[in-house]
């Protein structure tokens, strides 16, 4: 779950129609997404139409001959990628952190939880709910990974290490939304029906990360997102402890640790791609950054607020949970992690991609500095249905 670069330049919007454009490095190829938020019926009631993507997206951009690379990496993935998974019997489960329903002290435990949650501020609740909703849209993310050529689960139960990883990764991630959902439900501080509607809308809307069925692009995207999610959950853990809820702090910290482990796995894949096919990989990395990393929940909607994602991400930016600075820092980290500056023997396109990537973090930071002033001037109180319509500065 992350969102901050959208506040700088990623999206432009109106009250009823979002137009998400992307500038591809493929020359004339482009991808545009039109999201229809709502329409009006004859009686003046809003009829929601799930966000739709006009099919002008680039698809199947990886040359067919590259498929053999991922086939040849199956042995490597079996030995290196699957090692990042934890056995189910040794994994934490949501009930480890929640009141025990079979215990005679269950009601007292719930009461203690609710007392702790009274100290959580409304703006913190908005960020925590947004994190949870994003985690709950997990079906979308598994679907996205299974669009990638050469690594998708072809049968639903394929024994290839790529497919085994995707299913097991999904199973580990599934606990995150479950745990945060139950905790927020028990807290009594949020409108669960509005939250549940938002989750349903979001899963129904899908996402367009502009990965083009291309595993080079897909694994660069997941590397970025997992690190961003690690940062976000780590900051919600810190804030929960500051607000006096040590249990919630432990929950968010535990989720953050999972995200970091997953980040290591995905960055390891891209590291291997840089080793065996540096030119294609660096060009793909630059392509994803030119298009900007679209956030998993960018089609978020609750049936009321057409700009819900922007408002949510603004609160997260203000609290320091996930910011435009974090976006630049993640990019810098990946450039260094994959030794982009030290690549040699590249094509002319690869050299241009290398130069672009090495200079981009500084450019983003300058944009972020300019945007900060405009954001402060434009801030206003926004009602959030997740907290019964109470207003939060966004």
Curated annotation (Swiss-Prot):
Ubiquitously expressed. Fe cation 1 binds at residues 135, 173, 176, 259. It catalyses: octadecanoyl-[ACP] + 2 reduced [2Fe-2S]-[ferredoxin] + O2 + 2 H(+) = (9Z)-octadecenoyl-[ACP] + 2 oxidized [2Fe-2S]-[ferredoxin] + 2 H2O. Residues 1-37 form a transit peptide. Its EC number is 1.14.19.2. Disruption phenotype: No visible phenotype. It comes from the Eukaryota. Its cofactor is Fe(2+). Pfam families: FA_desaturase_2. PANTHER family: ACYL- ACYL-CARRIER-PROTEIN DESATURASE-RELATED, STEAROYL-[ACYL-CARRIER-PROTEIN] 9-DESATURASE 1, CHLOROPLASTIC. Converts stearoyl-ACP to oleoyl-ACP by introduction of a cis double bond between carbons 9 and 10 of the acyl chain. Belongs to the fatty acid desaturase type 2 family. This is Stearoyl-[acyl-carrier-protein] 9-desaturase 1, chloroplastic. It comes from Arabidopsis thaliana.
């Amino acid at each position: 779950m992350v969102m901050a670069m959208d506040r700088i330049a990623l999206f432009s919007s109106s009250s009823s129609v979002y137009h998400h454009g992307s500038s591809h490095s493929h020359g004339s190829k482009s991808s545009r997404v039109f999201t229809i938020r709502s329409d009006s019926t004859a009686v003046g009631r809003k009829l929601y139409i799930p966000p739709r993507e006009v099919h002008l997206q680039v698809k199947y951009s990886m040359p067919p001959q590259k498929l053999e690379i991922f086939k040849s990496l199956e042995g490597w993935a079996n030995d290196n990628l699957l090692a990042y998974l934890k056995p189910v019997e040794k994994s934490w489960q949501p009930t480890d952190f929640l009141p025990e329903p079979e215990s005679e002290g269950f009601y007292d435990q719930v009461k203690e939880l609710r007392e702790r949650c009274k100290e959580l501020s409304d703006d913190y609740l908005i960020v925590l709910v947004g994190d949870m909703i994003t985690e709950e849209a997990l079906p979308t993310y598994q679907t996205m990974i299974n669009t990638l050529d050469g690594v998708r689960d072809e049968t639903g139960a394929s024994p290839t290490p790529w497919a085994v990883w995707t299913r097991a990764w999904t199973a580990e991630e599934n606990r995150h939304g479950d745990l945060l959902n139950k905790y927020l439900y028990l807290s009594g501080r949020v409108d669960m029906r509005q939250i549940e509607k938002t989750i349903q809308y979001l899963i129904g809307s899908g996402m367009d990360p502009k990965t083009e069925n291309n595993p080079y692009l897909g694994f660069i995207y997941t590397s970025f997102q997992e690190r961003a999610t690690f940062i976000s959950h780590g900051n919600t853990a810190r804030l929960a402890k500051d607000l006096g809820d040590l249990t919630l702090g432990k929950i968010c910290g535990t989720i953050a640790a999972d995200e970091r482990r997953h980040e290591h796995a995905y960055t390891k894949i891209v590291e291997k791609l840089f080793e065996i096919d540096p030119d294609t990989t660096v060009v793909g990395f630059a392509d994803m950054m030119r298009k900007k990393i679209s956030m998993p929940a960018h089609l978020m909607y609750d049936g009321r607020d057409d700009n819900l994602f922007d408002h949510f991400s603004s609160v997260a930016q203000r609290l320091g949970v996930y910011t435009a600075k974090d976006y630049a820092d993640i990019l810098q980290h990946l450039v260094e992690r994959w030794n982009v500056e030290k690549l040699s023997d590249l094509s002319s396109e690869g050299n241009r991609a290398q130069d672009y990537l090495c200079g981009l973090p500084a450019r983003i930071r300058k944009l972020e500095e300019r945007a900060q002033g405009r954001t402060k001037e434009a801030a206003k109180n926004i009602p959030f249905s997740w907290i019964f319509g109470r207003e939060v500065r966004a």
